[in-house]
Amino acid sequence: GQESLAVAGNIFLGQTEAPLLVKGYLNKMNKSEYFLLMTGGMATVAGSVLAAYIGFLGGDDPIQRIEVAKNLIIASVMAAPGAIVISKLMFPQTEKVDKNIEISSEVTGTNLLSAINNGTRDGIKMAVNVGAMLLVFLALIALVNGVFYQIAEVFGLNDWIQQNTIYEAFSLELILGYLFAPLMWLIGVATEDITLMGQLLGVKLAASEFVAYIELASLKDIGSAVHLTYQKSVIMATIMLCGFANFASIGIQIGGIGILAPGKSKLLTEIGFKAMIAGTLVSLLSATFVGMLLG
């Protein structure tokens, strides 16, 4: 149905583009279906950004680029069924599913030109909303980090942090990073790498997977002063970071999906944070399976 179509689309489409595949069904979908829609978006990445990630991690080495591309594609494909499993465990389908949905020609368009017009209009409205929500969430994260920095500066913590960690100051990323270090141990990461892996997950959640992959590119370089000890950790990190699950994405999805189904905006805000958690669990599940196979 519409759920499987959206999840399948999320493998290579973005978290705001995939919902366009099921635009005509959005107003009739229930809470469990919306949760899967959002989780699928959080657990995967858009094909348009895969090239950037390959560039970050593969550098100028064509063989390394191929290996990174394989890992990223594997992560995206694994995330689709994982999103279904995790989302239905967190929000089981208890409501009646409407299987008799009629889609008006106003939604799909009466002809080719009408469909192009509708798609262009929806795309522009979505882009504006997504841009606004992303700007607000990134600004909020910057505000929190600014407050943390000033507090740490009073107690002289920033200098100590700069000398002893990969961070320059006390921040939300640092807190989340060390908070998730025990979780990295639970999914099978080597003890030597759990702190760095936890920091990568923290950066992904607080900032974005883009920033986390840039940091991973540095941490995978054995010539760096601070780097991951094992190649297995590098591969697991590549899989774990392959998803849009972060705080900014909550706003992106609320803005993107909300413009397509204005009546569901309240529901989107209610389940947005939980969808981010679910998307993170999907990525961790994929990384765990890959770690088991690597031994």
Q: What are these regions, as identified by a protein language model?
A:
Residues 1-57, 112, 198-277, 281-285, ...:
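Alpha-helical membrane segments and immediately flanking helix-loop junctions
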Residues 26-29, 54-68, 106, 152-169, ...:
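Inter-helical loop and helix-membrane interface segments of multi-pass membrane transporters/permeases
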Residues 29-39, 49-52, 56-97:
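Conserved, well-structured core segments that form the ligand-binding/active-site neighborhood
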Residues 41, 72-85, 157-181, 273-281:
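Small-residue-enriched core segments of transmembrane alpha-helices in multipass membrane transport
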Residues 43-55, 75-91, 133-146, 180-183, ...:
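Hydrophobic core segments of alpha-helical transmembrane domains in multi-pass membrane transport
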Residues 77-126:
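Long, contiguous bundles of hydrophobic transmembrane helices that form the permeation core
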Residues 111-128, 149-156, 167, 261-273:
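Hydrophobic, small-residue-rich membrane helices and short re-entrant helix-turn-helix hairpins
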Residues 124-221:
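Transmembrane helical segments that form the transport core of multi-pass membrane transport proteins
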